[in-house]
Curated annotation (Swiss-Prot):
Pathway: Antibiotic biosynthesis; novobiocin biosynthesis. It catalyses: prephenate + NAD(+) = 3-(4-hydroxyphenyl)pyruvate + CO2 + NADH. This is Probable prephenate dehydrogenase NovF. The gene is novF. PROSITE patterns: PDH_ADH (PS51176).
Amino acid sequence: MRTAVIIGTGMIGTSIGLALRKQGVDSYLMDTSPVALRIAEAVGAGTAEEPPETVDLAVVAVPPVHVAPVIASHQSRGTARFYVDVAGVKVSTRRELDALGCDLATVVGGHPLVGRPGSGPLAARGDLFDGRPWALVPAVGTDAAALNRALELVAACGAIPVVLDAEAHDRAIALGTLVPQIALTLVAARLTEADSGALRLLGSVWSEIPQLVGVDSATSWTQVLAANAAPVVGELEKLSRDLASLLETLRGVADGDGSLAEPDGRLLEFIQRGIDGSNRVPGRYGIPTETALADVDVSVDDRPAELARLFDDVAGAGVVMRGIDISQRPDSPDRTVTISVTPRDAENLLHELRRRKWPANS
């Protein structure tokens, strides 16, 4: 990837621009807000102008309700060869893209799972995505070259790609981010009725609880919640049944004499289920361990164009990358690029890369 356009210069879009510029990618910036655009350019995320010619990739970093119309508009103008969005909802976005007649072969849904206080370009950081999971959601007809370009973007930003389908993505986001945020919001709402003494007592404790969505991001958060309502309802119904069971247990405990005693076995079971569920989440995000993949290692020198040439050759081999890792070799300026593919594709990729004079090994 040599050129990119970032459409939307909030915290995410500007951070992507900073990361791409660090990798030598010529980045152009577009935004409906002249102020945000000037700030993003000033912090070094790219050039605040439309690209003079078709770019390799357009990153659409706009609120969820605008993703499909923006992609449709830029596809009609030929802005980029491929498109990636960063919205937190995928099923409804894909449905809207299809309804607008977009070329889904060139579009890959994306969603970097990051969060930090603040919003807008001044909150951006070039290392925002380092080591963080980044969901990639190709459609059934997505070109291999489009997915490979999206994987290249994720690698350039230092994130870890997780490839899955739209339905699985939305279910995961409902369970792991939206429902916890709803629960936290409901608890926080109870604080409006707490007395001032209780609030003083809870000040430092509450600050250690994961961040409640801020007013600056409330609109986009509610858009994701509304668009993802169906899987959220399903998870809340399960949570409601668990809560009803817990209430029944606690009512039984409350009917006692209030003395300290050994914990009720059902309460221990409740806590243990939470521990067991939390322990299932891998410490390192990436392709699920049950998915068998093969790695192909390629030595790439430090010229900026070489990494782009490698990804172009991988796409030319007709192979879909399922994961990628780039590491610096300690004894030279060269990098080792580890490409994860299916075992069936590994032999073909190795043959094609060697044919194109790449030093590749499996």
